[in-house]
């Protein structure tokens, strides 16, 4: 049995633990601060996203532990190591602005997951690779759906 000792994979996964923690806070902010048309539909959708990405974060952290890593576990570590940025909502935003922000973060995660897929494929870490492929597929679908909500094509 091959042992996964890649520092690169461990660093990548830890970076995603940080990203996913910051992202779940952003989803919660959208959930709390959304107003206007489509409120009921999108408010419920944010509940679903919050759960999904919370589960992703847990799976990534547990995979990191399984390969001998140590996931970040403090707010300070999350903020210092995430490429997903905090986004304080200090003034009201339209539903479209909130969804554009959400799509931007989803696209960042999608692109980083693609890098992780390539890294883990090169290293022969099939378990992590499969996990990232599944997560990326879900993100691709969310991007398509939210862009459709915004009246845009998926690759626009």
From Swiss-Prot:
Places the protein is found: Cytoplasm
Recorded catalytic activity of this chain's protein: 2 Fe(2+) + H2O2 + 2 H(+) = 2 Fe(3+) + 2 H2O
Record key words, sorted: Cytoplasm, Iron, Iron storage, Metal-binding, Oxidoreductase, Virulence
Keyword Metal-binding listed: yes
Primary location class: cytoplasm
Function: Protects DNA from oxidative damage by sequestering intracellular Fe(2+) ion and storing it in the form of Fe(3+) oxyhydroxide mineral. One hydrogen peroxide oxidizes two Fe(2+) ions, which prevents hydroxyl radical production by the Fenton reaction. Does not bind to DNA. Dps is important for full resistance to heat and cold shocks and is essential for full virulence of this bacterium. It seems to play a direct or indirect role on the production and/or stability of listeriolysin O.
PANTHER family assigned to the protein according to its UniProt record, in alphabetical order: GENERAL STRESS PROTEIN 20U (PTHR42932:SF1)
Protein name, as recorded: DNA protection during starvation protein
Species whose genome carries this gene: Listeria monocytogenes serovar 1/2a (strain ATCC BAA-679 / EGD-e)
Lineage of producing organism: Bacteria, Bacillati, Bacillota, Bacilli, Bacillales
């Amino acid at each position: 049995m091959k042992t996964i000792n890649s520092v690169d994979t461990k660093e990548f996964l830890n970076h995603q633990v940080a990203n996913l923690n910051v992202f779940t806070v952003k989803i919660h902010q959208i959930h709390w601060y959304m107003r206007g048309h489509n409120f009921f539909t999108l408010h419920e959708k944010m509940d679903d996203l919050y759960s999904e990405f919370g589960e992703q974060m847990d799976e990534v952290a547990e995979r990191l532990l399984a390969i001998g890593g140590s996931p970040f576990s403090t707010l300070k570590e999350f903020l210092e190591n995430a490429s997903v940025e905090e986004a304080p909502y200090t003034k009201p935003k339209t539903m479209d602005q909130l969804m554009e922000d959400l799509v931007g973060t989803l696209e960042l995660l999608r692109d980083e997951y693609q890098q992780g897929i390539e890294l883990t494929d090169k290293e022969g870490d099939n378990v992590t690779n499969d996990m990232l492929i599944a997560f990326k597929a879900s993100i691709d679908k969310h991007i398509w759906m939210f862009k459709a909500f915004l009246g845009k094509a998926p690759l626009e």
